[in-house]
Every structure is written in C-alpha cells, then in structure tokens.
C-alpha cells in the first residue's frame, strides 16, 4: 500500500523564505536551505519550494538554493515557480530537484507538459493547478483555473484541465484552492475529490490547512495521495512527526521510520 506523503511548502522570493519560519536553533529563518534541513531532520516525506520571484534575473539564485538543498538533504525536492520551458525544467533537475512543478506555462501550452514528460519522464513533472469555485450556491460544483497567484481568470474548467494534463504526461497534480488558501479552514475537499476521481495520477491537496484533522480529511475525504501544508509547520502548531502520528492513528498508511524529530517551533 502506498504511503501518504506529508509535504511542507516554502515560498521563496529573491532567495529568501517568505512568511518566514519559527524554528528553535535556526541560524537564519529566512534561508530556505536552513529551513529545508530542519524539515529533512523532522522526517518530511518531501519538500516543495515555490519561487514567487517576479524577475527572470533571479533564477540563478533559485538554482543555487536547489543545489545547496539537494546536497544537504535526503528528502525529495519539488521546485516550482516561473517554469516556462523544457530548458527551465532541465536546469532545475540538473541543480538537484527531483520534480519540477509547472503552473501558468502549462495553462498557456499544455503540450509543454508532454514535451517535458517525454524528455525527463512523467515522474519528474508536476502540474500545479490553482482553482477557484465559480458555481453559484445550489448549483453543481465547478472550479475555474486562475493564474498569476490567483489573480487572472482563464475560463478553463479545473477538472477538465486536470484530465488534460494527466493525459499529456503529468506524473502528479498539485491542487490548490485559492478560496481556501490562507484561511486555515481546511482543504476544499470537493475540489480535491473531483480531481482525484477524474485522474489516475497522484493528487496533492493544498490550501487551507488549519489543523491535523484537515490533513486526514484531505486523504480520507478528498482522495489525495499527499498533503501539502505551510503555516502549521512553519509556526510551530505541529511537527511533522505529530502530523504523521495523527494521520496513522486515523488509519492512514504513513512512513514512520527514519528521522522523526518531534521538535517544533515556539508559538
């Protein structure tokens, strides 16, 4: 039975962690490599870096961060943000990323997913889907793809797009509810379930985690294969080890071996 994965996520801008992290003993809370080391020691199954730097000039900084993180950490690393070409994917993989997440570029050109998957293998390619519910109350649920941090509507149905990019060769889908993101009110379980039911590739639930029960629900109710969270880990509400124990107690298959530091940050 495949184990459910817990994936902390770090937003990186201009080479620094945005929204910071609070870890005891961390020399530099703004250094993504230092934060990654903590999550690696804590037993995170994977780590996700999302680069929200606007300028292309800063890509060299991101590649350096990926390289230093890959050297220092054992856990798999997914990197996304600003990926526009097959060459961008190649550069990140060469720097040490295990997977590359494609967002806006996949919406503009779904065949980019096919080209990247053909060249590097589907297991390396994640498509990040940012969606908002657009159906009126009482109507069948429907979600639209938004790009550029949830600002720009596309008119594209999220579930249909998920099917398309899975067929194009995406090995995994990172599904974020823009309605729920930052609310700490739990994942949009209907969105997660609709997409996980529509595709055969793994789905990562993202956006809205407020507590450990939300992680359980993402899998048990949303059908996700992995759960992504940020604030509950960054700010010390729970450790990765506590999250794994809670999910295992709920009957989910978790990887409990290996490093499992229960240390967490002061609130």
Curated annotation (Swiss-Prot):
Belongs to the HisA/HisF family. NCBIfam families: hisF (TIGR00735). Pathway: Amino-acid biosynthesis; L-histidine biosynthesis; L-histidine from 5-phospho-alpha-D-ribose 1-diphosphate: step 5/9. It catalyses: 5-[(5-phospho-1-deoxy-D-ribulos-1-ylimino)methylamino]-1-(5-phospho-beta-D-ribosyl)imidazole-4-carboxamide + L-glutamine = D-erythro-1-(imidazol-4-yl)glycerol 3-phosphate + 5-amino-1-(5-phospho-beta-D-ribosyl)imidazole-4-carboxamide + L-glutamate + H(+). It is an enzyme of class 4 (lyase). The lineage of its organism: Bacteria, Pseudomonadati, Pseudomonadota, Alphaproteobacteria, Hyphomicrobiales. Heterodimer of HisH and HisF. GO terms for biological process: L-histidine biosynthetic process. The active site is at 11, 130. It comes from Methylobacterium radiotolerans (strain ATCC 27329 / DSM 1819 / JCM 2831 / NBRC 15690 / NCIMB 10815 / 0-1). It is found in: Cytoplasm. One of its GO terms (molecular function) is lyase activity. Keywords: Amino-acid biosynthesis, Cytoplasm, Histidine biosynthesis, Lyase. The keyword Cell wall biogenesis/degradation does not apply. Its main location: cytoplasm. This is Imidazole glycerol phosphate synthase subunit HisF. IGPS catalyzes the conversion of PRFAR and glutamine to IGP, AICAR and glutamate. The HisF subunit catalyzes the cyclization activity that produces IGP and AICAR from PRFAR using the ammonia provided by the HisH subunit. GO terms for cellular component: cytoplasm. Its EC number is 4.3.2.10.
């Amino acid at each position: 039975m495949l184990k459910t994965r817990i994936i902390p996520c770090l937003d990186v801008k201009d080479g620094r962690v945005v929204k910071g992290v609070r870890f005891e003993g961390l020399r530099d809370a703004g250094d993504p490599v230092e934060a990654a080391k903590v999550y690696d020691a804590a037993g995170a199954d994977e780590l996700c870096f999302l680069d929200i730097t606007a300028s292309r000039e800063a890509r060299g900084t991101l590649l350096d961060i990926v390289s230093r993180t890959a050297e220092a950490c054992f856990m798999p690393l997914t990197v996304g943000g600003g990926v526009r070409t097959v060459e961008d994917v190649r550069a990140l993989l060469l720097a040490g990323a295990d997977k590359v997440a494609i967002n806006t570029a996949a919406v503009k050109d779904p065949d980019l997913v096919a080209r990247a998957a053909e060249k590097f293998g589907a297991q390396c390619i994640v498509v990040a889907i940012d969606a908002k519910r657009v159906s009126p109350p009482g109507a069948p649920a429907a979600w639209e793809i938004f790009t550029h941090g949830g600002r720009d509507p596309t008119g594209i149905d999220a579930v249909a797009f998920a099917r398309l990019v899975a067929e194009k060769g995406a090995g995994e889908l990172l599904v974020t509810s823009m309605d729920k993101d930052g609310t700490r009110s739990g994942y949009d379980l209907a969105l997660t379930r609709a997409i996980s039911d529509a595709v055969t590739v793994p789905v990562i639930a993202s956006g809205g985690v407020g507590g450990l029960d939300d992680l359980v629900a993402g899998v048990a109710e949303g059908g996700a294969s992995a759960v992504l969270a940020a604030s509950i880990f960054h700010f010390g509400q729970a450790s990765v080890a506590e999250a794994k124990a809670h999910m295992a107690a709920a009957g989910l298959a978790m990887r409990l071996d290996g490093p499992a530091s229960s240390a967490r940050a002061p609130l």
